[in-house]
Amino acid sequence: MELKDYYAIMGVKPTDDLKTIKTAYRRLARKYHPDVSKEPDAEARFKEVAEAWEVLSDEQRRAEYDQMWQHRNDPQFSRQFQHGDGQSFNAEDFDDIFSSIFGQHARQSRQRPATRGHDIEIEVAVFLEETLTEHKRTISYNLPVYNAFGMIEQEIPKTLNVKIPAGVGNGQRIRLKGQGTPGENGGPNGDLWLVIHIAPHPLFDIVGQDLEIVVPVSPWEAALGAKVTVPTLKESILLTIPPGSQAGQRLRVKGKGLVSKKQTGDLYAVLKIVMPPKPDENTAALWQQLADAQSSFEPRKDWGKA
């Protein structure tokens, strides 16, 4: 299996902290998201960045990955390696650690009559927009071939055309019967499990079946009310901002969230009041007039009150 340089993919150093890596991830996710990027390889780069983040954002996975990367060129790596506690590390453990990072289960086989083949688990990145309808996907994975000692002797590339149903959720598992490793002595094949990973979106956050989007509005739009154009997963809509709206206020748009077999979620627009740039003399005078007209308004009067 190829061990990718996740730090290089993220443009960070192995010594960088999680905050730095998270910042790099958010920047790259926005840069390469297919809805935003015009680069021809944007989707592939986006999935690569998401894969790197999946490992580096988890403290245990990152530690295991760092250990593997350090010894990647060691010819004895797959046979004799040392855990941090000094215990022996052999090829059986290698599969366990590698699967903990890449989400694959390559368990050591045992010689038994009519033994069932191993299951294989792979992660499939799905964009939010793709969850609305059933779509076809071509997936590629490696089919392990085990020797008589239950160790992986080689891996055979395999490609399948699969259907991803509408309404899939993050972490959902889809079973493809018989697409795992072959059974032994007439035993049934293992299964292939597709684990759905909903890719981060530059605009929407997922909250259960609902979606949240931050909607920037001007102070006068919040004060006077307005109608603003807001994107949804399907199309743009005209959202009514009520007069006197506050920063952080949530406006519900029914039926514009995620779709599943049981229900359709809602979209919540979270208002963010954005101030204009530093005012010139004329604009400052207008703000002062407003301040004078609202001199009795005290925004901090309820501080410290239950």
UniProtKB/Swiss-Prot annotation:
One of its GO terms (cellular component) is cytoplasm. Pfam families: DnaJ, DnaJ_C. It is found in: Cytoplasm, Nucleoid. One of its GO terms (molecular function) is unfolded protein binding. Keywords: Chaperone, Cytoplasm, DNA-binding. PROSITE patterns: DNAJ_1, DNAJ_2. InterPro entries: DNA-bd_curved-DNA, DnaJ_C, DnaJ_domain, DnaJ_domain_CS, HSP40/DnaJ_pept-bd, J_dom_sf. DNA-binding protein that preferentially recognizes a curved DNA sequence. It is probably a functional analog of DnaJ; displays overlapping activities with DnaJ, but functions under different conditions, probably acting as a molecular chaperone in an adaptive response to environmental stresses other than heat shock. Lacks autonomous chaperone activity; binds native substrates and targets them for recognition by DnaK. Its activity is inhibited by the binding of CbpM. This is Curved DNA-binding protein. The gene is cbpA.
